[in-house]
């Protein structure tokens, strides 16, 4: 193998830039070495690569793309590097860079929220384009989080008056009346992921204030019956655990000026044996209807710990 001096368009300007690009203790470079079968050596702000010409070219483009993002003030994470490597191997780095061009909104700490994968980009675009969107895929793909982010963004911009978040309490058989405690105590354990997303985007205090004013409503699916939801962003989470009747009931609540986002994972159905999933039925029945988007995410869109994607892939192969 031939040692190359990696020829970048611009040299690294300072140690801080090098740290952002290389990762803590060169962790990002180690990921590249492993995935691209290279040896990468750094001397100050200069990079040397030992590997074949093809791998060298991939690494050159990869580091150039990451550096371009860093110079735009975007903080690079391990997940970003892993996804960038995949895109570089497919010669699709221009799409990787373009994902970071649009900020959806900022979280409670003022940090920019952006899509992290091409699948997420398609999902967010669908939510902008259509009033009814299904986000279907495994855990960790950002289905629920991005739906909440878009809902908050719509509320901040005055496009809607209310956010409604719901999910079936299938673990309790939707029979919450048989559980001890008041409604909030009964419902909260099943809706915790929705609270977590809201707290990240709005902060816990702001979320509570909006809930007290009725601007944000979090409730079990059974409480949607008989309502028409106008000027609202309505999110149904864990939709794989609805029955077809529950799904129909929910979808027909859609009112004027509203959007509905339905998220779920058809591989994680917890319904009693023999009961069909409302999400699985809707996925087939509503496919191709104008104004409805069916977005399917997969393990390449997982934005949790890198091992999560590998675990999902292993189980998918088994099934």
From Swiss-Prot:
InterPro entries reported in the protein's UniProt record = P-loop_NTPase, PhoH, PhoH2-like
The entry's localization annotation reads: Cytoplasm
For this UniProt record, the keywords arranged alphabetically read as follows: ATP-binding, Cytoplasm, Nucleotide-binding
Q: Where does ATP bind?
A: 137-144
Please tell me whether the keyword Nucleotidyltransferase is annotated for this protein: no
Q: Does the keyword Nucleotide-binding apply?
A: yes
Identify one Gene Ontology CC term for this UniProt entry.
Answer: cytosol
MF annotations from Gene Ontology: ATP binding
The cross-references to SUPFAM superfamilies, in alphabetical order and at most eight, read: P-loop containing nucleoside triphosphate hydrolases (SSF52540)
Q: Which family does it belong to?
A: Belongs to the PhoH family.
Query: Which protein are we looking at?
Result: PhoH-like protein
The UniProt gene name for this protein comes to: phoH
């Amino acid at each position: 193998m031939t040692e190359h001096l990696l020829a970048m368009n611009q040299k690294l300007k300072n140690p801080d830039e090098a740290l952002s690009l290389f990762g803590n203790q060169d962790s990002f470079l180690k990921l590249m070495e492993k995935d691209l079968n290279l040896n990468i050596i750094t001397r100050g702000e200069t990079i040397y690569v030992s590997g074949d010409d093809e791998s060298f070219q991939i690494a050159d483009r990869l580091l150039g793309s990451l550096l371009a993002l860093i110079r735009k003030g975007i903080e690079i994470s391990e997940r970003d590097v892993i996804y960038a490597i995949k895109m570089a191997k497919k010669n699709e780095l221009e799409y990787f860079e373009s994902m970071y061009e649009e900020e959806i909104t900022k979280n409670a700490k003022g940090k920019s929220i952006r899509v992290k994968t091409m699948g997420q980009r398609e999902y967010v675009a669908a939510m902008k384009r259509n009033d009814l969107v299904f986000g279907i895929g495994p855990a960790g793909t950002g289905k629920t989080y991005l739906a909440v982010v878009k809902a908050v963004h719509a509320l901040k911009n005055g496009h809607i008056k209310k956010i409604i978040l719901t999910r079936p309490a299938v673990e309790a058989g939707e029979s919450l009346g048989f559980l001890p405690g008041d409604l909030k105590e009964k419902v909260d354990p099943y809706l915790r992921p929705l609270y977590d997303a809201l707290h990240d985007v709005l902060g816990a205090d702001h979320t509570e204030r909006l809930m007290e004013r009725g601007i944000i409503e979090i409730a079990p699916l059974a409480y949607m019956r008989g309502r028409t939801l106008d000027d609202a962003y309505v999110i149904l989470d864990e939709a794989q655990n609805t029955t077809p009747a529950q799904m129909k009931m929910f979808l027909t609540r859609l009112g004027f000026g509203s959007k509905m986002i339905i998220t779920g994972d058809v591989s994680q159905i917890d319904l009693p044996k023999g009961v069909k999933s409302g999400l699985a039925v809707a996925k087939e029945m509503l496919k191709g209807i104008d104004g409805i988007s069916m977005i399917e995410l997969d393990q390449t869109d997982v934005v949790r710990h890198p091992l999560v994607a590998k675990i999902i892939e292993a189980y998918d192969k088994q099934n």
